[in-house]
Amino acid sequence: MQPQLLLLLLLPLNFPVILTRELLCGGSPEPCANGGTCLRLSRGQGICQCAPGFLGETCQFPDPCRDTQLCKNGGSCQALLPTPPSSRSPTSPLTPHFSCTCPSGFTGDRCQTHLEELCPPSFCSNGGHCYVQASGRPQCSCEPGWTGEQCQLRDFCSANPCANGGVCLATYPQIQCRCPPGFEGHTCERDINECFLEPGPCPQGTSCHNTLGSYQCLCPVGQEGPQCKLRKGACPPGSCLNGGTCQLVPEGHSTFHLCLCPPGFTGLDCEMNPDDCVRHQCQNGATCLDGLDTYTCLCPKTWKGWDCSEDIDECEARGPPRCRNGGTCQNTAGSFHCVCVSGWGGAGCEENLDDCAAATCAPGSTCIDRVGSFSCLCPPGRTGLLCHLEDMCLSQPCHVNAQCSTNPLTGSTLCICQPGYSGSTCHQDLDECQMAQQGPSPCEHGGSCINTPGSFNCLCLPGYTGSRCEADHNECLSQPCHPGSTCLDLLATFHCLCPPGLEGRLCEVEVNECTSNPCLNQAACHDLLNGFQCLCLPGFTGARCEKDMDECSSTPCANGGRCRDQPGAFYCECLPGFEGPHCEKEVDECLSDPCPVGASCLDLPGAFFCLCRPGFTGQLCEVPLCTPNMCQPGQQCQGQEHRAPCLCPDGSPGCVPAEDNCPCHHGHCQRSLCVCDEGWTGPECETELGGCISTPCAHGGTCHPQPSGYNCTCPAGYMGLTCSEEVTACHSGPCLNGGSCSIRPEGYSCTCLPSHTGRHCQTAVDHCVSASCLNGGTCVNKPGTFFCLCATGFQGLHCEEKTNPSCADSPCRNKATCQDTPRGARCLCSPGYTGSSCQTLIDLCARKPCPHTARCLQSGPSFQCLCLQGWTGALCDFPLSCQKAAMSQGIEISGLCQNGGLCIDTGSSYFCRCPPGFQGKLCQDNVNPCEPNPCHHGSTCVPQPSGYVCQCAPGYEGQNCSKVLDACQSQPCHNHGTCTSRPGGFHCACPPGFVGLRCEGDVDECLDRPCHPSGTAACHSLANAFYCQCLPGHTGQRCEVEMDLCQSQPCSNGGSCEITTGPPPGFTCHCPKGFEGPTCSHKALSCGIHHCHNGGLCLPSPKPGSPPLCACLSGFGGPDCLTPPAPPGCGPPSPCLHNGTCTETPGLGNPGFQCTCPPDSPGPRCQRPGASGCEGRGGDGTCDAGCSGPGGDWDGGDCSLGVPDPWKGCPPHSQCWLLFRDGRCHPQCDSEECLFDGYDCEIPLTCIPAYDQYCRDHFHNGHCEKGCNNAECGWDGGDCRPEGEDSEGRPSLALLVVLRPPALDQQLLALARVLSLTLRVGLWVRKDSEGRNMVFPYPGTRAKEELSGARDSSSWERQAPPTQPLGKETESLGAGFVVVMGVDLSRCGPEHPASRCPWDSGLLLRFLAAMAAVGALEPLLPGPLLAAHPQAGTRPSANQLPWPILCSPVVGVLLLALGALLVLQLIRRRRREHGALWLPPGFIRRPQTQQAPHRRRPPLGEDNIGLKALKPEAEVDEDGVAMCSGPEEGEAEETASASRCQLWPLNSGCGELPQAAMLTPPQECESEVLDVDTCGPDGVTPLMSAVFCGGVQSTTGASPQRLGLGNLEPWEPLLDRGACPQAHTVGTGETPLHLAARFSRPTAARRLLEAGANPNQPDRAGRTPLHTAVAADAREVCQLLLASRQTTVDARTEDGTTPLMLAARLAVEDLVEELIAARADVGARDKRGKTALHWAAAVNNARAARSLLQAGADKDAQDSREQTPLFLAAREGAVEVAQLLLELGAARGLRDQAGLAPGDVARQRSHWDLLTLLEGAGPTTQEARAHARTTPGGGAAPRCRTLSAGARPRGGGACLQARTWSVDLGARGGKVYARCRSRSGSCGGPTTRGRRFSAGSRGRRGARASQDDWPRDWVALEACGSACSAPIPPPSLTPSPERGSPQVAWGLPVHQEIPLNSVVRNLN
C-alpha cells in the first residue's frame, strides 16, 4: 500500500480531521489555521489535521474541552461543533460548545451538584426515598402509609378505604371520601336511590328504576332517550314552544326528534318554565322572584347582595350619626345598636340619665348632675364625696405648708406633710442632716449639710452645684471659648478645644498663615481662618499662583496667526497681510501705491493686484504689451486691456490685417483678441476668477480659483470649505461603533451604545459573562444582547424549559422525515444519518464497501471509492473490460454476468445488460419494486411477487399511503379536550387542569403551591382540582382563613378564651381555680390535661394534692416524658448490674457494650444466675433479687409473675434472658420461643405526636377511632373490634395489681393502654353481663374462703377499698385488685407475618412475665403487678389464681410496719406556742411545719383511720409566690363553693364583724405556728386583706386596740411576722402593692416598699402597681412609686400600654405632668403603634396633649394604621386637641392605610366643625371649645378629674366624678342579683357598678333569663354587704381606642353600666 494512503487511514484514529470538498492544500494562505497541517488527498482535495486544542473544518475553533476543570467531579467533556440554522446570518458569530457526561451521583451542566446536596438523608421522613426531578427539585417517594411533600404525614388513604371510585382525602383525625355521583356514605359504600329524590330525576309520566350508581327512566311507548325526551317521527311544525329548536336524532333504523329548549324552559315541548325559586339561596327573609333560568332575591332594607347575605352597615351609612352624644355605633346582623358612654341611655344614646335622681348627698348639700355621675356641692363645714363628713380642716390644725383633708373613712383630720416635716399635724421639722449620720449624706460629692426648717442646704465643694451637690458645675455654660471652638467641662475648670487656625487658652488668637510668604510670582497674600488666599497677577493661577496660565489655549490669534506663550502674557506671529495684537487687522498693501501711474491697485488678503491700464501687463504693470517688431509692416500695435493686437490703420494701402485665429480657452477670438466668458480672464481666457474675488477663505486661508469655484488652503487649526471650522478633538472621529463624541475641557469623551464599552467604544460588551445558559446551552454574544443555543430537548431564553418536541418544532435534521407519535416526534432519517434527530453521520467507510483494496473516501452522507489500477465502477468492483474481468475471476466471459446477462465493453470498462426482472452490476439481484420507494409519508414498502404493498405510518392510508387519515374521528382526547388532526397523528388542546397527549393526565395543582403555607398541613391533588388539608385553627379553600376558635366558646367551667397567634394559631383557655385542661373541662390535679409526651401514660399521683405523674415509654424520661432516650451503649444508666464496669464497643449501628463483672455476677450483664441459700425461698411470694435468674427458676416465679421460666423452649446456649429488651437486636433471640428478643429487632412503634394525645383521651371510650386503631396507638382499647366479640370465649388475662381507689378508673385505662402498647395487642377491661367493669377487690387473707368456688361471680360486689393499703409501696395507699382484661389476638400469629406479637394467651403471659423478670414492667404501670393468669371466663376462681403473694406472712409484716409508721408519725408531730394574730374572716388557719419547702403528706390510711382530712398547702409558682390550691379532686362542688367563695353582706362594714371573727379563729392545734400567708378566697392573703381594709374605724366601737393591734396598722404585725409582700391573687395576679395602689393606700404602699415589695411586679394583664395607681388616680401612691429608684416608669402591659399612655387616656392630667417630670418616654408606642399623644387626641384630652407636645412628642407620629394624632382627633370629634395640633403645624395631608386624610374622616363622621377647622377657616380655640360642648358628635365634653375613695380634689373644685366599678348583675325572681364585689364606705373600697336587669329581661345571648341561668354564687343585690373579706373585684381595663373615650372598670367587663348613685340607693 502506498504510504500516503496508509497515512490517510491512520489519521482519523488519532487527530480531529475534517474533510471538505473545497479545501485545497498548497494555496496561499494555507487553509488550516492555528498550526493545523493540510494533508492532501487524491484529486486535489485536502483535509486539516488540527493541533491539540483546536477543531473545525480549518482548525478555526478553540477546543472548549481543553480546560480540564470544565466538567467537575470526574465528568467527561465532549466538544460540539456549531451547526447554524439555515435562517441564521452568515456573519453571526458561532463558537463550539461542550457537553458534560456526569458520573453516578452528580448532576448539573458541569456535574457540579452532588445529588446528596439536593436530597440530604433527612429530607424524606418515615423511610421515604428522595430523588431529583428533571427540573432539579427534590421529590420524595413515600412508603405506603405516608404522604406529604416530605412524607411527614400519615396517609390514611393508603389502604384505599373509599369504595365505588370514591376519592380519599386525608383529614385529621380520620379520612374523608369524596364520592362520585350516585354514591354516598363515609366510604361511598351506599348507592343513592335517585328515584327517591324530590323532585325525581325522570319526567312526569315515566317510571324511575334505580341502578348501581345511577338510574334509568322507563319511557312510555313512542319515547326514547335517558330522559324520555326523544319522540318517534319527524319534527311536526310548531312542536317546540318558547323558542325551542327541534332536532332529528337517528336511532338505529328509526328517526326520533327532541326539543332543545332555551335557558329557562323545560318539558318535552319546552312548555314549562321551572320555578327556580324552589332551591333558592335567598337569606335573611328575602323574597325570591322567579325568572328565566334564574331568580332574583328581593332583599329587606337591612341586607344586600345577590343572595341578601351581605349586611348593610347602618353605622357607615350617610346621614346623621345613628348614635348621639359620643355613643359608639356597632353594626349587627340586620340591625345595629349603640354603646352609650356613661351618663347617656336610650336606643340612640339620646337620653341623658339623671344621676341626681338617686343621689345620696347629705342634707343641705346640692347635687349636681354630671354625665355618667354626680357630685355633691357641700355647704360650709361639710366635706366628703356625699358631704356626709364634718370638715375637720376649718380649724387649720395642720402646718401652714401641709395639706389638710378630712379622712373620708374615719372623718378625722388627715395632714399630708410637705417634705421635711413630720408628725400628725406636720409641725415637727425633720433634721435631714442628723438622719444622714445613720446613712448616706443627702449632700453628694463631699458637700456639707446644713439643716433648715422643712429642708436642708448643701455647701458644695468647688466644681459642684445643685441642691444636693449632685451636679458637676458646667463652666462651659458661660461659653468662655472663642466661637467655633469646643468647650470641654472639667472638674472645677474647663478646657477649650481649638479648631485649626486658632490658638490660645480661649482659642482667641488667630494664626496668620501669610507670615511664611506662601504666594509666588509676586502675588498678594490674604490671611484667612486656618488658611490663606493668594491674589494672583494676570497670567498666573493656582492656589499659590505657581502656575503660568497658557494664554494660547484660548487661541487668541486670528487669521492663522501663531500664538507664542510667555510668562504672564502672549504674542501673535501674524501671517503676511495681517497685523495687530491678535492679527485681527488686514494689511492694505495698496496704501503704498505699488502700482504705476494709470494702474489701479486691488487689495487682496496678504497681497495686492494691479489692474493695468491698456497696453501694460505684469505684477506691477511694468511690461508693455506692444513690443518692437511685433506687427507686420504697415500694421500698428494697439495696446488694449490684457492684449495688444496689430491693426491696419484706416486708409493704409497695402496693409494686410491679422487673422482672427487667436487661441481663447474660455472665450472667442475677435479681431485677434480673446473675448473671455464671464468668470474667466487672461490673454487666452485661461484663468478662472471664480469666488476668489470675494475672498471667501477665512482665518488666513489661501484661495485657489478652480473651474467650478475655488479651493481654500487652510492654516493649522482650521478646516472646512472656507476654513471657518475650528479643528477639535472630535473631528478625527475617535469614538467607534456608533459612539457619540463630546468636547470636554480636558479633550473629549465618548458616550457608547449599550453594546460597546471602553474609552473609544472599542470593546464589545460580552453579555455572556453575566448570562447563564442552562442545561448545556451555549451562550452567543450579540451587539447589545445575547442568545442561548439550547441543547436538544430544551428551549427558552436560558434553555430552562424542557421541550417535548413535535414535528411542528422541526426537530429532525439532515432532510429527515418527521412523524408525530404519542411519545413525541420521531425522525425517519435519510440514508447516511442516524440518531434521535438524525444528527449523527454514519461512518459509511467503516463497513468497507470498496473491494479490491480500493480506498474509501466519505463525503457527507455518501462515500466514494478510489479504485486501484485495473478496476473501475462506483465500488471499484468492475475490471476495465469483460475479458480482463473474466480472466481475473477464472471464469468464462459468458459467466461474468449472472442470470443470463450479457457483458458489453464500453470504453475502458464494461457493464452487464440484464434480462428483464434482474438488476445489479452483475445482474445478481432481482428487481425490487420498492426502489425507488413508492410509499409516501415515511411508510414501509414490502416487496411482493406481483408488486409491492405499502405499510402506512399512523395517520395515513391509501395504496401509496398518500391519504391523510382524520385521527380525530375516534375522539382520542379525554376530559373534554379539543382534537386537531395533524399529519401522522392528532393534537389535543387540553382544558385547564389536564395535560398529556390525550389530556388524560390530571395536572398536579399542588406543584404551584396553591395552599396558604402557614395554615396547610398537606396539599392533595384531585381531578382538575386540589384539596388543602388545613392545620388546626385554619379553614378556607386554601387554608388562608384563621378561625376564631373562641367564637364557639370552647372553654368550659367559666374559663376565658384567648386567641393565640401560632403557628399554628389556636386558642388558650384561662381556667378558673380548680379546673385545667385545654378547655378547662378537667378538674385540677387530674390526668385530663397533663400531657405525657412520646407515648407516655398519665397516672394519678400517689400523693393526694400532688400533680399527676407520667409513665414514659420507649426509653423517654422526665416529668413529661420529654427527656430523650439514653444513647445506646453504656448509658447512663449503666446496663451492667451489681457494680459491673461497662465498656462501649463499636457496632454496625448504635454502639454496643461489654460488661466487666465481679466474680459473684458472671452473667453478660453481671446477673447472678443462681445463688447459694436460695433453697426454699422460691415461691414464698417475695422476689429475692439474688435468686432471680434461670438458675433459681426466677425465684420460683416470685420475680416473674408466677411463671417459673418465661424463656422455656428458648435454647439455653443463646442466653436470650440476658439480652431481653437491652435495646439491641440479637437475631438468635428473634423467635417465638425466645419472645421475639423483646421486640428489640423491630422498629420502635410510636404513636404520631399529633394523634397521641387524642388517642389517649379517646382510649376505650366505646367509639371506634380508626386513626388510633393500630399497634403504635394501642388498638384504641378494643373499640374497633366487631360487635359481640366480647364474649365468654374470648381470651382474657386476669391481673393482680395494686391500684389507688381515688383514681381507679383513670388507672385502669392507663393500665390497659400501657399493656396494649407494650405487648402490641388490644387490651381492655372486660365488662360483665350487667355492663360493669370486671374489677374485684382482692380479699387478701380471705383468699382460701372467698376463692374456693363457693361464691360465683354474681355474688361479688364492688366493695370499698380495703382498710389497709396493699402493695409494695406504703406511700401509694393502694389496694389489691383483680382486673380481668379482654385480649384481641386476631392480628397476631403466622397468618399475620407483618405483626409480630403474641398470638395465644400462654405466649402473652410469658412475654409479660419476662418483662417483669428483667424489671422492665414495673416502671410502666400505675401500680405493682403482682401476678397474672390467662382466663376465659368472667370471674377467676380460687384455684385459678396463682398468687399467694398477699396471703404470705410477708404481707402481715408489711402491714404491721405500716401501722407502726402511722403511730410514729402522729407521735413525732411537734407543737409550738404562738401569739394572737389578726386574720380576716374566711381565712382557714393551717399549721406551718418545719418542712416548708416540701409538701406535707396526709396521714397514711386517713380514709380508714377516720382522721380529718388536711387541706393541701399553697403551691408555689415559678416566681416563688404562694398560690392557693383548689378543692380536692372528688370534692363536691357545693362544698367547694361554700368554703372557697363565701359571700358577705354588703351592708356591714369591717368593724361590724363579730369580735370573734376579727380575732384569730380557733385552730385544730393551738400550739402550732401560724402560717401568715394562708390563702383565703381567690388566693387573698391576710396581708392583702389588711391593705384592702387598712385604716378602718369601726362604727360599733371596735377600735384597733380592741382588735389587739394597738396603734399599729393591720399590716404591720403581718409584715413583722414575715408575711410575703410578693404574693398575688389567683384570678388577677395582683400583689399587696397593687391593692395599695388600687385603693389609694399610700401608707401601706410606703410600708410595702420598705418591706421589699417589687414595684415592677406585673399582674395577669401585665399591669404594674404604677399602672394601677394611674388608673385609680392615686396620686400619693404614684409619687411614692416614682420616687423609688426601682420603679420602671415605662413599664408596659401585655398590649404595650405605659403608665403615661394610661394617664393620657384616662384624662388624669396631673399625673401626666408628674410622669413627664419623671422622664417617662413621651415617644413610646404600644403594640398598635400609638403614642400617648394618640390617646390624648382620641379622648380630647387637650391639657395632656399640650404637656406631651411641650415635652417633645411627635405631633405627626403615625401608628400601625398610619393614623396621626390629628387623624384620631378628627375621627373622634376632639376639637380642642385638633385646634392645638393645627396651631403647632400638624400635617393635615397625611393619610392612613385606607387613603383617608383627617378631613376625609371628619366628613365621614359628620364633624362639620372639625372639617371647617381642617379646611383652614376654623373658629378660634374658645369657639371650638364652646361648639364642642353643645354640638352632638362634635367631640367629648371636658372631663372632670376622677377620684378614688380616700382622695380629695386638689384645688377645692367641686367637679368630681365617682369612680365606677363593674359588678355582674342579673335578674331573677324580680330582684337584682350581683356577684358581690365591694363598695366604698368604711372599708374604703370602690362603689360597685354594673348591669341591671329587671325580672324576665333578656340575658347576654338574648334568651330569657331564668334562675338556672345565674351562677350559684350570685345573691340578691340588697343582700350584699361590704365585708372586707369578700373577694376583691378583679380589675379590667376596657379602653375603646377606636370610638369614644375609654372606660375603667374593675371586674368583669359588661355591656351596660349603672352609675354609683343607683347602687348606693339600692344599698340604702
From Swiss-Prot:
Spans through the membrane: 1444-1464
LNR repeat feature ranges: 1166-1209, 1210-1241, 1247-1287
What does the UniProt record tell us about how this protein is modified after translation?
A: Synthesized in the endoplasmic reticulum as an inactive form which is proteolytically cleaved by a furin-like convertase in the trans-Golgi network before it reaches the plasma membrane to yield an active, ligand-accessible form. Cleavage results in a C-terminal fragment N(TM) and a N-terminal fragment N(EC). Following ligand binding, it is cleaved by TNF-alpha converting enzyme (TACE) to yield a membrane-associated intermediate fragment called notch extracellular truncation (NEXT).
Q: Would you list which residues are glycosylated?
A: 711, 960, 1139
Bilayer disposition of the protein: Single-pass type I membrane protein
- The signal peptide here is 1-20
Its annotated function is as follows: Functions as a receptor for membrane-bound ligands Jagged1, Jagged2 and Delta1 to regulate cell-fate determination. Upon ligand activation through the released notch intracellular domain (NICD) it forms a transcriptional activator complex with RBPJ/RBPSUH and activates genes of the enhancer of split locus. Affects the implementation of differentiation, proliferation and apoptotic programs. May regulate branching morphogenesis in the developing vascular system.
| Assembly and oligomerization | Heterodimer of a C-terminal fragment N(TM) and a N-terminal fragment N(EC) which are probably linked by disulfide bonds. Interacts with MAML1, MAML2 and MAML3 which act as transcriptional coactivators for NOTCH4.
Family matches, as PANTHER family: NEUROGENIC LOCUS NOTCH HOMOLOG PROTEIN 1, SLIT HOMOLOG
Q: What is this protein called?
A: Neurogenic locus notch homolog protein 4
**Species this chain originates from:** Mus musculus (Mouse)
